[in-house]
A protein has these predicted regions:
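Mature N-terminal segment immediately following signal peptide/propeptide cleavage
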Residues: 31-50, 54
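Cleaved targeting-peptide boundary
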Residues: 22-29
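Post-cleavage N-terminal segment of exported redox proteins
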Residues: 5, 20-21
């Protein structure tokens, strides 16, 4: 009888006992259900609790995530085309309005973290249209699928462990939705970055990246912790441009953020 034919409670008890196994990846969805108990052992050994393990066992293989992972066309565009496709002019226009409407808030963020409003607004606009669309894919299933898939398993498995720990903490739920690669909230944090750099910006005692204040504080904290130098430039060749590279590895994305941020702040 395959592992996924056992009652859920039996699988969970097996996952919470014994040493972790090396968890094999696969390029098709056929072995996903058999993979989950093995991944659960690895997660438990990494410190994931019962709530996180239960969430992992409830996931399903996400064909939508695999499709998106194989079809990231926009990062292959020229800078001009990329900015056109991603709506740079609208982001700049909206960014200026939002900065003016929330001047004290962005000034306080910059005073605390050293990151200017334009950078945060450019990222916010680029990632989710200023929170208008934060995704429609189950986060845990998306990240688990990418951990299971051989293409980038080593990269995504730590993010899966982090997502399960976020569930243990109550920062997300098993039903939380995000982008196709499991990114979370207003600025689309991967779970590992959310766990490491997330900030309870509004002081309610809970990290929630779908909350605007938490998301902006967390984004600024990420950049500062990655080496952002307050007052230094962020255009190509300037000290803080390398920190934008930490946010997204695509050159056109980095260049677009730098251009939009300067125009928002200008």
């Amino acid at each position: 009888m395959p592992p996924h034919s056992f009652p859920k409670a039996v699988i969970l008890s097996l996952c919470l006992a014994g040493p972790a196994l090396a968890t094999p990846c696969s390029d098709t969805g056929g072995q996903y259900e058999s993979w989950k108990p093995l991944m659960a052992e690895e997660a438990q050994a990494a410190g994931v609790g019962r709530r996180g393990i239960e969430a992992l066992m409830a996931t399903s293989y996400s064909k939508a995530t695999i499709g998106a992972d194989r079809n990231q066309k926009s990062f292959r565009y020229s800078l001009e085309k990329f900015m056109q496709v991603r709506g740079a002019d609208a982001i700049i226009s909206q960014g200026r309005k939002r900065k003016a409407q929330n001047a004290d808030f962005y000034a306080a963020i910059e005073a605390q973290y050293g990151v200017p409003a334009g950078v945060l607004l450019a990222i916010h606009g680029m990632e989710t249209g200023f929170g208008n669309f934060m995704g429609d894919t189950n986060v845990v299933s998306a990240i688990a699928t990418l951990s299971y898939d051989c293409r980038r398993s080593d990269f995504f498995t730590p993010h899966l462990i982090a997502a399960l720990k976020l569930i243990d903490m109550g920062a997300i739920s098993p039903q939380t939705v995000g982008a196709k690669h499991g990114e979370l909230g207003h600025t689309q944090f991967l779970p590992g970055n959310a766990l490491t750099y997330g900030v309870d910006g509004n002081g309610d005692g809970q990290l929630d990246l779908t909350d605007f204040v938490d998301a902006m504080a967390s984004t600024a904290n990420f950049l500062r912790q990655k080496g952002w130098r307050p007052g230094a430039g962020y255009q190509p060749g300037e000290p803080n441009f390398a920190v934008i590279e930490e946010w997204n590895a695509a050159t056109v994305y980095q260049q677009a953020i730098a251009i939009m941020a300067a125009r928002i702040d200008g």
